Each structure stands twice: as structure tokens, then as C-alpha cells.
A protein has these predicted regions:
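Domain-level signal for soluble alpha/beta catalytic cores
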Residues: 1-149
Length: 149
């Protein structure tokens, strides 16, 4: 059994991040691309610094209260439809997702706390508030494959 599985099945509280996009939107003057949102911020110094500050805050809080923490990659919209709508090349799907995972590994190393688990965040292919637009299972698996790999 993995450390993650043991942790979440232990009944012990686990801190998670939350509202990353909302925090960037309301706490900073940083402009986010409306299609890929925080996924593209790692390509820019100011965006990267803000994301590091936000994620580090969750790690710091977990350390302060001796809790495990799960932080999710800023990749909710780093998927085919949103990458296309942003006018980015399809190769950026893999690049942005790998970059985000590496970024959070760095945050974890700098945080001086264990355990810090990293979750790969995969969002919907369309509007998350319109469940009728959800893809059938097989089509969803194919659509999300480039992001998951």
C-alpha cells in the first residue's frame, strides 16, 4: 500500500489546497489567459512566484499543524480543448503538465515538511458547470490521455 493510500485511509485529517485560480485572480494583478488560466502562469516569472507563494502557504500550514498535505497541479485547464482555444500548440499539453508536476516537486523540496503529496489535476473537456456536456467514459479516457501521460 502506498504512503498516500495509508494516509487517506488512516482517518487522519489531510490538508488540501483550494481555490488556486480564485486566489490569483483576487489577490494579484496578474492576468490569466481565460482559456488555460493558471496553467500558463508557470511560463512567466511573476506568475511562477505567485503560485510558489500560494502553494508554499499550504505546505507551511500543514507543517504548523503537523498534517499531511495534498497539493494539486495548476493544470485544470491544461487539456486539448482549452489549449487549442488559447492558440497554443498541442505539444503544450504535455509540457505544461510536466512543468507543473516538476514545479510542485520543487515546492515540496523547499517546504521542509513531510508528507506532501502531489496530485495531477485534470479538468473537464468543457464547462464544468454543465454536466450534460460530460464525455462518455471511453471518449473521456482518450481526450484526457495526453494530459494524464
Amino acid at each position: 500500500m502506498s504512503d498516500f493510500t495509508e494516509t487517506v485511509t488512516s482517518g487522519r485529517p489531510v490538508l488540501t489546497d483550494g481555490g488556486i485560480e480564485t486566489r490569483v485572480m483576487f489577490e494579484t494583478p496578474i492576468h490569466m489567459d481565460p482559456d488555460v488560466q493558471v496553467a500558463a502562469l508557470l511560463d512567466h516569472r511573476d506568475g511562477r512566484m505567485k503560485l510558489e507563494s500560494v502553494y508554499s502557504g499550504y505546505v507551511d500550514a500543514a507543517r504548523e499543524f503537523s498534517l499531511p498535505v495534498l497539493i494539486g497541479t495548476p493544470t485544470f485547464r491544461a487539456s486539448p480543448n482549452f489549449i487549442r482555444r488559447a492558440g497554443m500548440p498541442e505539444e503544450d499539453i504535455g509540457r505544461l503538465n510536466r512543468q507543473a508536476a516538476g514545479f510542485l516537486k520543487d515546492v515540496r523540496e523547499k517546504g521542509g515538511h513531510e508528507p506532501v503529496f502531489i496530485g495531477g489535476v485534470i479538468g473537464p473537456s468543457g464547462d464544468a458547470y454543465l454536466p450534460g456536456q460530460a464525455l462518455p467514459v471511453a471518449q473521456a479516457a482518450e481526450y484526457h490521455r495526453p494530459q494524464a501521460e
